[in-house]
């Protein structure tokens, strides 16, 4: 049994090479053809056309007859009609109807519930019908098949491109979901920022308590210093009194010594006079005078002993006062040292908390700016993608309309359905992207509302947005308007700095110059010594 390709080759060798016209009319009975045919070349639904056998049969003629194809391009549509009529004639011929099952025929195949009529391509049929019109019609149909092939490949490339865009949009969707998760993480960081703020507030309260305790201890220290000054004054008075008493005692001692010497001289003179003129004065008078002198001497000794005892007591009191003063001074120095250490620890703790709060605020601002920048970039990308998709959809629609007007085959309907399905998928992706954009904007607004908190260093409020709850707690409209004006002015200034690089450069230079000037003043400042 001959193969189909051999039969077509024999028909090609026996058929003449001349072509007269591509618009020859062939009388045939038109029969109904199936809408979709699975060809061997494509493997997908296509118009009801001969597959590889007819392509092999007409390939050489098509390669040698491009000039004929260009010459008959103006009558391409009638040639297509004539080709369809010629194939109807072939299907209605007696050789096809009377073909036996064991001959070289293509059996009927079921494609989607439809059957394709088998045709006989043997040498007998080629010998009976080998007119040039039939060849020209085959050439026209082959050209139409090649055009459809190119269009189908182009549509497949577009479909692959749309699929790639779809996967890219899906990846962007996943990226947006990850960004939403990152925003949730940033909200957790904001919770930690709130905790740091509460810890800073507690530290400030503890600092205030420590300052109050320090003031109380300072008052105690002042009282102790006053007591020390009073004791020092008492000690000075005691020393002065002791010196005065010493002077008086020395004077009294000198006087007593003089009196005693005078008395002794008097006694000696009396004794000498007693031996000379004992008869002149009585003895009892002399004895009375001696006793009187002895009594005075005893009184003087008693006064001297009492003065010495007073001096000893004053010395002991002075030593006790000095010991008390030393104890008070040591206690005062210990209290001062402990208070200074506590103050240094509180200052270091508050400085660390302030640094943490400032770092958190800077990170929050940077995160907000980064999110805004990414949102703007994503918005611009989404707009570009939407414009490209709209343009592509419009191009596809226009081409689909052109193809629908140009093509009369039923195979284009399936491609149209496929393109419409892809268009619907693209529209769904666009709607999903719009929904994601709306969610992103809402999340950004919510994040802006949550992150605009007042972090004040040394009781100075931070920048607050117009949606901050502090503004809603202010009942005075003038104060609220003033705060809103300051907030909007700061926001405009920041937006101007963000949009103008020269303004940012000027601000940075101004910032550096001001800090250098401040450091110069701090380093060269010498306080006046009065």
From Swiss-Prot:
Q: What is the purpose of this protein?
A: May be involved in maintaining Golgi structure and in intra-Golgi transport.
InterPro entries, alphabetized = Golgin_subfamily_A_member_5
Look up and give the membrane topology term: Single-pass type IV membrane protein
Residues crossing the lipid bilayer are: 505-525
Could you tell me the gene encoding this protein? Answer: golg-5
- Which portions of the chain have biased composition (kind: Low complexity)? 457-472
Q: Name one Pfam family in it.
A: Golgin_A5
Does the record carry Membrane as a key word?
Answer: yes
First-listed, main subcellular location of the protein, grouped into a coarse class: Golgi
Where are the compositionally biased (Polar residues) regions? 69-91
> Protein name, please?
Golgin-84
Q: What's the source species for this entry? A: Caenorhabditis elegans
Residues in coiled coil:
163-446
* Disordered, as annotated region: 1-26, 41-116, 368-388, 453-477
Q: Which residues lie on this side of the membrane: Cytoplasmic?
A: 1-504
Compartment(s): Golgi apparatus membrane
**Per the record, GO CC terms?**
Golgi apparatus; Golgi cisterna; Golgi membrane
Q: Topological domain, Lumenal: which ranges?
A: 526-530
- Gene Ontology terms for molecular function: protein homodimerization activity
Q: Which key words tag this protein in UniProt?
A: Coiled coil, Golgi apparatus, Membrane, Transmembrane, Transmembrane helix
According to the UniProt entry, which residue ranges have a biased composition of type Basic and acidic residues? 94-107
Q: Which GO terms describe its biological process?
A: Golgi organization; Golgi vesicle transport; retrograde transport, vesicle recycling within Golgi
């Amino acid at each position: 049994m001959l193969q189909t390709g051999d039969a077509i080759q024999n028909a090609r060798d026996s058929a003449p090479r001349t072509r007269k016209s591509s618009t020859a009319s062939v009388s045939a009975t038109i029969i109904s053809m199936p809408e979709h045919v699975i060809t061997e070349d494509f493997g997908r639904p296509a118009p009801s056309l001969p597959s590889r056998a007819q392509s092999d049969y007409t390939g050489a003629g098509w390669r040698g007859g491009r000039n004929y194809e260009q010459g008959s391009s103006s009558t391409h549509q009638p040639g297509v009609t004539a080709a369809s009529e010629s194939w109807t004639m072939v299907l209605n011929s007696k050789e096809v109807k009377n073909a036996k099952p064991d001959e070289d025929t293509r059996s009927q195949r079921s494609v989607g519930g439809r059957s394709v009529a088998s045709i006989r391509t043997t040498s007998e049929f080629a010998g009976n019908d080998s007119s040039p019109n039939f060849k020209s019609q085959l050439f026209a149909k082959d050209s139409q098949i090649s055009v459809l092939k190119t269009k189908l490949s182009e549509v497949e490339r577009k479909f692959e491109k749309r699929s790639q865009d779809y996967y890219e949009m899906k990846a962007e969707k996943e990226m947006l979901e990850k960004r939403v998760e990152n925003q949730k993480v940033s909200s957790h960081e904001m919770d930690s920022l709130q905790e740091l703020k509460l810890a800073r507030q507690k530290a400030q309260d503890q600092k205030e308590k420590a300052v109050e305790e320090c003031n109380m201890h300072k008052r105690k220290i002042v009282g102790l210093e006053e007591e020390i000054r009073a004791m020092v004054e008492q000690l000075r008075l005691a020393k002065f009194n002791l010196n005065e008493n010493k002077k008086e005692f020395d004077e009294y001692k000198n006087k007593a010594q003089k009196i005693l010497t005078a008395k002794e001289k008097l006694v000696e003179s009396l004794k000498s006079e007693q031996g000379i003129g004992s008869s002149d004065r009585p003895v009892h008078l002399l004895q009375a005078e001696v006793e009187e002198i002895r009594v005075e001497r005893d009184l003087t000794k008693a006064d001297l002993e009492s003065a010495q005892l007073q001096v000893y007591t004053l010395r002991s009191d002075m030593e006790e006062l000095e010991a008390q003063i030393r104890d008070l001074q040591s206690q005062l120095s210990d209290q001062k040292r402990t208070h200074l250490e506590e103050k240094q620890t509180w200052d270091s703790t508050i400085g660390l908390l302030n640094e943490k709060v400032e770092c958190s605020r800077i990170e929050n601002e940077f995160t907000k700016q980064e999110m805004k920048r990414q949102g703007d970039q994503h918005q611009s990308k989404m707009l570009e993608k939407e414009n490209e998709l709209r343009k592509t959809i419009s191009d596809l629609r226009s081409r689909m309309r052109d193809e629908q007007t140009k093509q009369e085959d039923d195979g284009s309907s399936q491609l149209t359905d496929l393109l419409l399905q892809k268009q619907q998928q693209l529209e769904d992706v666009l709607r999903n992207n719009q929904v994601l954009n709306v969610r992103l904007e809402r999340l950004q607004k919510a994040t802006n509302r949550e992150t605009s908190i007042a972090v004040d260093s040394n009781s100075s409020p931070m920048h607050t947005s117009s949606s901050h709850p502090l503004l809603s707690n202010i009942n005075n409209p003038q104060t609220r308007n003033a705060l809103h004006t300051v907030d909007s002015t700061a926001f405009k200034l920041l937006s101007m700095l963000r949009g103008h690089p020269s303004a940012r450069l000027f601000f940075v230079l101004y910032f550096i110059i001001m800090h250098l000037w401040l450091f110069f003043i701090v380093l060269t400042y010498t306080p006046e010594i009065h």
